A protein has these predicted regions:
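Intrinsically disordered, low-complexity cytosolic regulatory tails
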Residues: 1-38, 77-80, 297-308, 315-387
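Glycine-rich ATP phosphate-binding loop
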Residues: 66-87
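Regulatory alphaC helix of protein kinase catalytic domains
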Residues: 96-101
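Short beta-strand micro-motifs within the conserved protein kinase catalytic domain, predominantly
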Residues: 113-124, 132
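Catalytic-loop of the protein kinase fold
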Residues: 170, 175-188
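Conserved catalytic-loop aspartate of Hanks-type protein kinases
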Residues: 242
Length: 387
């Protein structure tokens, strides 16, 4: 078999030259095929089996798919992650289409790059760039060597990267509401650069949804502990639903506690989110901090960071900031943290001005959102509740 000429790695037809430079030309899709069939590399199942040593190294699993590490051998060698969807599930098929039908979302450094796909019979696969440092969830909750524990500055940088990725999704045409923002869907590359992943539940919506009062009515789905409570009550999905989920992520990154942990409920009589927010209201933010972190946090930066998490996790969507505002505030906090570490002068009063004392908010319609408010049969509290 004679290999066909490799495509020009700098051609505008190939948005990811570092991957496309070594691929042989794929079979031309039918003209009636979906647009994404002409945007991404089409692999054969034989190629994926060869790349993964017959799917021998599983690196992740979710309700409707498994993820395997693979190696594409060619003119430019590349380690990849291959997602294998459950071939007996209609939901898996829908999730595959959700990943493939949002092609423009890949054009941002903080969004995971889709390389290609494979369809063979009822089998569906997607191929992504490989993230050596795994997920933020894994870094926060696995029993890591203390030497590799994420520093406060590194956590800030990761949060900024993730926020930029979400902001990008919220600013396109159409807009994308991710609907599953959580630490396990924020991946980390070799340089600890954060990338948003897993668009199985995402919704494409018109740009008019950028208006604060606009929404999409949809079946409630997401992960318990990260779902917007306003979305739970009303069934109305907005851009601010992602903002709420990111607020939970900010608190989790700071504390290394999962939102569904029962230890706080048993000790304090309140759930983790209520405890986080109460600590901010009572100016006890230090109690939230991951005790494994060294004392390296500028106090004013800590207060400002906690205030952003507090505002994002407001039960009322209209009171939450936009992701653009979140990015700006986090970048400012990182700047002052760097000044603090370098012993350079900065203005704590200026930083404190973005973190006024929070005010308590009344629960939505008198509802308190305990973990028992949603029941999911055959799943534990960490599993996905999908539509």
């Amino acid at each position: 078999m004679v290999a066909s000429k490799s495509p020009d790695p700098y051609s505008a037809k190939h948005p990811f030259p570092n991957f496309f430079s070594f691929w042989r030309k794929a079979k031309k899709p039918n003209e009636d095929s979906p647009p994404w069939t002409r945007l991404y590399r089409m692999f054969t199942l034989k190629e994926l089996r060869l790349a993964t040593d017959n799917f021998g190294l599983k690196i992740g699993q979710d309700g409707h798919y498994s993820v395997y590490k693979g190696f594409i051998n060619g003119g430019f060698n590349e380690t990849v992650a291959i997602k294998m969807y459950d071939n007996n599930s209609l939901i898996s098929h829908r999730h595959f289409l959700s990943e493939m039908e949002l092609p423009w979302k890949r054009d941002h450094p903080n969004v995971l790059s889709l390389i290609g796909y494979c369809i063979q019979g009822s089998h569906r696969y997607t191929v992504f760039e490989y993230m050596p440092h795994g997920t933020v969830h894994g870094q926060l909750h696995s029993k890591n060597d203390p030497k590799t524990l994420l520093s406060w500055k590194k956590r800030l940088e990761i949060c900024i990267g993730a926020a930029r990725g979400i902001q990008f999704l919220h600013s396109g045409n159409p807009l994308i509401i991710h609907r599953a923002i959580k630490p396990s869907n924020i991946l980390l590359d070799n340089n600890w650069f954060a990338k948003i992943s897993d668009f199985n539940l995402s919704k494409m919506v018109p740009t008019r949804l950028s208006d604060s009062d606009s929404h999409v009515s949809t079946v409630i789905c997401g992960t318990l502990g990260y779902i917007d409570p306003e979305y739970i009550v009303s069934g109305l999905l907005t851009l601010k639903s992602d903002v709420y989920s990111f607020g939970v992520v900010l608190f989790e990154v700071l504390s290394a506690r999962k939102p569904m942990e029962r230890s706080i409920l048993e000790e304090q009589g309140i759930n983790v989110m209520q405890w986080w927010r109460q600590c901010v209201e009572d100016d006890r933010v230090g109690e939230i901090m991951d005790p494994r972190m060294k004392v390296e946090v500028a106090p004013d930066c800590l207060k400002a960071y906690a205030d952003i998490a507090y505002k994002c996790s407001n039960e009322r969507g209209s009171e939450r900031p936009s992701m653009a505002d979140v990015v700006k505030r986090l970048e400012l906090i990182l700047l002052f943290q760097e000044c603090f570490e370098a012993d350079l002068p900065f203005s704590p009063s200026w930083l404190a001005s973005i973190a006024p004392s929070p005010k308590k908010n009344e629960p939505l319609s008198g509802v308190e959102f305990q973990d028992s408010d949603i029941s999911v049969s055959d799943y534990d509290s960490e599993e996905l509740l999908r539509d």
